[in-house]
Amino acid sequence: MNREIDSAREQIDAAWLRSDADGITRHLAEDAVLLPPNGAKQVGREEINTWLRGLFQHYTMTELAMPERELTVSGDFAFERSLYEWLLVPNGEGEAIRDRANWVGIWRRAANGTWSEICGIWNSALPADVSQAKAETAEAAGSS
């Protein structure tokens, strides 16, 4: 493992639990890319910060665990693969979202030796709700 990246990951995870977009994005490169599931890519630290602030207006993460994590460093790049478990609770009406998610993060070491995350992507490790998908597909087919 890499102490600097490990420390940054701990700080990022703690920031998620505080709904702290700045605490998350301070560890990202200026040109970072975030690829959330079922949504548009977010490009650049500022755009990612805005996306996170929007998320935190609606949800608060109250549980976060990482039962699996692997980090491979190769030269000035590091590749992180993790399994996350989290609970997002709505700040108003609605249902909480519990998920297990596969995460891949790519880190880059700058000329001054500091590491920043340059790309992150995740997807749910839970099975898709096939009955809901079938109902939505049937509804869409009927409305064509």
Language-model segments: which ranges?
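A beta-strand edge to alpha-helix "cap/lid" segment located at domain peripheries
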Residues: M1-R26, V33-S144
